[in-house]
Amino acid sequence: MKLITAIIKPFKLEEVRASLDMLGITGMTITEVKGFGRQKGHTELYRGAEYVIDFLPKIKVEIAVSVDQVNDAIDAIIKSANTGKIGDGKIFVSSLDKVLRIRTGETDQDAI
């Protein structure tokens, strides 16, 4: 089992959710986060004053999938989150040692 963590632009969340849903991946955790990568933030004008915005709003999507779903899930996220502009995000894939559904006690693949 793998944990896929994707950091995406907030307005792309619904597209990402819909493309994962088409693969049968319906469970996910969404977190509002702030951060920056190569774009290093930006400046904005507010009431005539210039402000530096160091951290940009992003969405963190976390999904647990079986090993055979990893590549399809990554492809779906890339296709739906891509704008072709800087700041589109990142995808991280890590191993899951154990998954447990609290309500039923199911474990691993059955718990996903």
Predicted features, each with a name:
Residues M1-I112:
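Positively charged, small/polar-rich N-terminal and surface patches that mediate targeting and assembly
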